[in-house]
Amino acid sequence: LSRRVVMYHLKELSFREFLQFEDFRLKLPKFQLDDLLKNHKKIARDLKQQLTTPIKYFDAYLKHGAYPYYLENRQSYASKLNQTINLILEVDLNAVENMPYEDSRKVKKLLIAIAQSAPFIPNITRLSERLGMSRVFLINAIKLLNRADLVMELYKPTKGVGALTKPEKLFLNNPNLVHVLGNQNAEIGTLRETFFANQMKHLHDIHLAE
């Protein structure tokens, strides 16, 4: 029998999953988005009976809660996450996309540029001039970073998305990446916006408002 590989897209830990790693005694139910919107006060009161300091846990989640290897050593988490990013850019892109090393270095340069400003509305012409890339290479590189779960692309709902369509707004894929690649002192609004988009995108279609 030939070997068969089942592909599975394993996303980051949710905040609920992170909490259960932090305290195995917690029994936290799942909630549908509609239920949260309609009954958020009651849900918050019920959760408060189990979880007395949610903000403390949430702050920790934003810094190191996305990937479970934080459990091995929290002090070296940022370094290990940086190593994972380098592995994706320098090894995985070459293996999957047959990308030369020099091009992977350009993609890394792009990721750093995004990290310094995310979330932001990209000016493709200005970015391509600044980074020394063609427009086509730049847009393709953004798509690759999105597929690698390093950035998120957002579009307006009325706009068609094609292979060479530039995103309306770019985010880093989760708050941990904001801390590691962008800014250790990132604004809490940026972190919360990134968190919300990350948690919603796997279960819902999210768009920029018109």
Language-model-derived ranges and their functions:
Residues 2-105:
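Interdomain motor-coupling "hinge/lid" segment immediately C-terminal to the ATP-binding subdomain
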Residues 71-210:
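Accessory nucleic acid-recognition modules appended to NTPase machines
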